[in-house]
Amino acid sequence: MLDLAPLARFGGRVATGLLDVTSDPEALDSTGFWAVAADFEGRLTCARFGDVRPEPVPAPVPGAWHGPATDAWTSSLDRVAYTAGVHRIREHIAAGEVYQANLCRVLSAPVAPDADVDVLTALLARGNPAPYAGTIRLPGHGVEISTASPELFLRRTGRVVESGPIKGTGRTEADLLQKDYAENVMIVDLVRNDLGRVCATGTVTVPDLCVVEKHPGLVHLVSTVRGELPTDAGWPELLTAAFPPGSVTGAPKSSALRIIDALETAPRGPYCGGIGWVDADRGTGELAVGIRTFWIDRADGMLRFGTGAGITWGSDPEGEWRETELKASRLLAVASGAYDVSGGALS
């Protein structure tokens, strides 16, 4: 493994000079600039950096990233197991246990010992640009993440907080179904409830509902939920109320989490967690939902990537499998060197 220095890269800034690392969310209301990685299963890593400066994502260096072969990826759930899981969730819905649940699978492939997630971030910035893209590289703490997330989990500006749940995916707007719009509204209601647990009474609003956003290779339905924190609430209370993100769990959240645990065969890790930064000095921060996200598992020598879909009563099992393939295909191609980041797929 390379001797890689700790680094974080988000929003046109790079952070170096690691000062300290903690799992205590209260640190995010203290001082300094923090990189934040919260695994879906609850492990929180907050890293404070001393040197933060403007820097665009560098251009990819040819040959710097040695990704896995395109046929090296394996899935924690194959097509048969995944579609069976969709059927099982529909049975839970019919029984009245849940209205919606997100079923995910984790893809894995061997990674070179010299792999650097920040180099992968440079490739993704060209091949799959995303509003919440970034890097967290903390090799000594088991956190090496490259994300091309399109989804806002939590943004905080002073006391104002905002979430931007995504539900509904298609190749084009014409592919979006009534099921997608209904699912988005359902998750918006869940996120409203989550923020309502911590925000001041009467401050939670929905400024935007089911807006179509275009992203590389697909479109999403995106909504905005906003609220205002009372003076006695900060990051610990906000994360307790809202984590894990509602758009990647289901509704009701507690029932969906139980069903997910029974059906999924691999931990999600950073996938579907929260990834981003907090500037405690300015009272600002931005955490993405950890989708479209790669991470390196050094213990197993694997590069991992998660993909999933929200399952409702109206779901078609094969259609949901295809949605997971659509979400993954472009990014896996970039990571495997099968996608020319300056143009398109390589022959």
Describe the role of every protein-language-model region.
Residues 1-347:
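Extended alpha-helical targeting/anchoring segments
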